[in-house]
Amino acid sequence: MSQLDALREMTVVVADTGDIEAIKQYQPQDATTNPSLILSASALPQYASLIDDAVAYAKARSDDKAQLLIDAEDKLAVNIGLEILKIVPGRISTEVDARLSYDTKATIEKARQIMKLYNDAGISNDRILIKIASTWQGIRAAEVLEKEGINCNLTLLFSQAQARACAKAGVYLISPFVGRILDWYKAAEKKEYAPAEDPGVISVTNIYNYYKQYGYQTVVMGASFRNVGEITEIAGCDRLTIAPPLLKELAESNAPLVRKLEYKGEVKTRPAPLTEAEFYWQHNQDPMAVEKLAEGIRKFAVDIEKLEAMLAAKL
């Protein structure tokens, strides 16, 4: 049995890509996209018709240049999601514009808009996750959306404070990042880490155990991996979203895989929710989390602007 097949027996495997051919090859349960992956996918020739459709959709809705871009961008992300949903049996995660990460109201409106595009294409809410950055404002938006039946995937999650706030808000799923945490520590500490000592692995393990210890139903989906060792060290996590090169490596390995995450203790009484002040104080005690959250939002915003430049040339 390959490591990938062994992993599927203990964890829901998700493909972290917008590449339809890769998704067909590895047959994940779900798929996740983000602005960077949408940008990469848009360069593939098989997506040309999806771009043309998004442009035509935008032109039919507005004459305003700024609105045209917004509409085309949303429709393209949904078009790619629709293609992926023809292959995966589960859900697609589609991300809200990262530039709205500190605006609760705008995030809610954008999420509703994305979901409407899917609904108009005949896709029900239970096949979509709306990805939102795990800022205080994003978490508050997700809290509202979950009550409306719009499930959310809270991404760019690096701190225990973010994880606690997401759990209390009742979000459907969180994506704690592994590899980006490792990147920060390697740069800061000037050292290499064995998989079991990887700070990203330790972070996800702690979050997983915290959620199970207090009986939270929020799904923990480890994300952002730099090597297979990070994946095997958190085998047993609820879900793992994995890029095609690492899916390939797992599929080609027959090394034994041991389940690492499994909580068997008692469920305890939940702690009081964090106030906004407590959230910021605790999150800001972790310089890695502060820097990586801000950097992640900036990077996604840059790729959104590149995507808009590509679309603007066609509008």
From Swiss-Prot:
PROSITE patterns, sorted: TRANSALDOLASE_1 (PS01054), TRANSALDOLASE_2 (PS00958)
Pathways per UniProt: Carbohydrate degradation; pentose phosphate pathway; D-glyceraldehyde 3-phosphate and beta-D-fructose 6-phosphate from D-ribose 5-phosphate and D-xylulose 5-phosphate (non-oxidative stage): step 2/3
Substrates-to-products reaction catalysed: D-sedoheptulose 7-phosphate + D-glyceraldehyde 3-phosphate = D-erythrose 4-phosphate + beta-D-fructose 6-phosphate
Function as written in the Swiss-Prot or TrEMBL entry: Transaldolase is important for the balance of metabolites in the pentose-phosphate pathway.
Keyword Cytoplasm on entry: yes
One Gene Ontology molecular-function label: transaldolase activity
Cross-referenced SUPFAM superfamilies: Aldolase
UniProt enzyme class: transferase
Location of the protein in the cell: Cytoplasm
Family named by the database record: Belongs to the transaldolase family. Type 1 subfamily.
EC annotation from Swiss-Prot or TrEMBL: 2.2.1.2
UniProt-listed GO biological process terms: carbohydrate metabolic process; pentose-phosphate shunt
Membrane-spanning parts: none
Native source organism of the sequence: Actinobacillus pleuropneumoniae serotype 5b (strain L20)
Gene this protein is translated from: tal
Assigned keywords, A-Z: Cytoplasm, Pentose shunt, Schiff base, Transferase
Subunit structure and binding partners: Homodimer.
Identification of the protein by name: Transaldolase
Catalytic residues, chain numbering: 131
An example Gene Ontology CC term for this record: cytosol
